[in-house]
Amino acid sequence: QVVQRDHHAEYITTLGVIAGTLAQIALEVRHLQRTEVREAEEYFSPKQKGSSAMPHKRNPVKSERICGMARLVQGYALPAFENIPLWHERDISHSSVERVMIPDATTALDYILAQTTDLVDKLLVYPEKMLEDLNMTGGLIYSPRVLLALVSKGAYRDTAYRWVQRNAMKRWLEGEDFYENLCKDEDVRKYLSEEEIKECFDYKPMLILPLIHI
């Protein structure tokens, strides 16, 4: 009597997954816009207000709206699943739900797509601040590259891990120079020259792999 509602459930859940992906983009912007990070932020027009009480604020209102609307779309997944079982394939308990669910979820996702497109198109990015934040680690972000360099030269991975970790912890806990400590470490120097260690302390090769995937 009626079309099986699993098709409708698949459609609604697909919308929910898309909404979740867009919300992930928006959530990343929200984190990057935090005062202590500020590596990227939403476009902020000259006459825009970030807060009615605090004139200095530049709240990521568009990103927050995207995240909120995504929850709404994803919330329709439950009634979509509950619509699948029908009495003898002929009752219309699904109808009242679908009259709200399908148009609302569809138009909401359309709105989220438009908002996310505008967010990305106008996104303000601050590479200098990104580099500044990277440098705050004192080179600790390069520990994986040092580890891989040691392994490529024949060191056992677990052993090399301990060598790199002990020098990294000196930086983390005592503020010592990570690079200099590696250069002074007799175990590390058995496998890597000072120049080879220095080559590990370069962020540019770390950007290549993401670009390949994009």
Mark where each language-model region is:
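A short hydrophobic/aromatic micro-motif that marks alpha-helical segments and, especially, helix-coil
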Residues: 74, 169-172, 190
